[in-house]
Amino acid sequence: MSQESPKPTIQMSCASVPLVHEVEVLDEAGRRKLTHIPGERSLTIYLDKREVVTLMTLGGAPEALVLGYLRNQRLVESPDDIESIQVDWETDSAAVKTRRSKVDIDALTSKRVVTTGCGQGTMFGGLIEEMAEIRLPDGPQLTQEAIIALVEGVRVHDTIYKKSGSVHACAVFEREGGHGVRLLHFIEDVGRHNAVDSISGLMWLANRSGRDLMFFTTGRLTSEMVIKGAQMGIPVLLTR
C-alpha cells in the first residue's frame, strides 16, 4: 500500500440527493409501466465566493467531485489549502473556502481548451502543453487474469447502471496477491469526467498516490480522461 499520512483535514458537508427517479412510461405496445431514470442536476462551484463553473452531475459524491475538479483544473495546489467544502442541494451550489490561495485564477481561467468527448469538457490554462513534463512510474505488471478479475469486479458491483442505465462508471484498483485486484473506489455519474474527478478527490482526501494503481472507465478514453489519469499519477488506464 502506498498510502501516506497525515491526511488533509477539510470540513465537509455530507449532502445527499436521490440518485434515481421512478417514472411512468409507455412501452412499444402502448402499455403503461414504471421504470427508473438517473437524476441529473446542476452544481455550481464557488471558490472563495467566486463562481467558477456549473457541473451537471448525478450527485452521488458531490464533495469529492468538487475537490477533484479543483485538483484536476489546478485551481487549488493542495488539499491542505482548503478549509471547507459545503454542498447545498437546495441552492444547487458548492461553497469552497480556502485557507490560503496561491493560484492566480484569472490567469489560469483566461485560456480554455475544449476537449474531446460527448460532454465537450473544458480544461483551463496550458495543461495540455505541460503534459509532456509529467513523468509516470512503470506501474504494476498486469496479467490477463488480473485484467479479467478487474472487469469482473466492476461487473458484479451493485450499480445505478443496473437499475436505470444512462450513467458511466470509473474505478481504481490495486494489485492483490498473484493475479488478484482490490477495488478501492467506484463512482458512477452521468459523465465519466465527473466520475474521474470524484475519484481524484477521494484519492486526495486519502493522500493516496496513484503510482501503483489501475484506473478503469466505461466508454472510450478521451483526451480529457487520459490527461486526468496522468495528473493523478496513475500509470495504467483500462476501458471497456
In which residue ranges do the predicted regions lie?
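Feature captures the catalytic cores and cofactor-binding loops of soluble hydro-lyases/lyases
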Residues: 192-240
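Intrinsically disordered, low-complexity regions enriched in acidic/Ser/Thr/Pro/Gln residues
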Residues: 2-186, 190
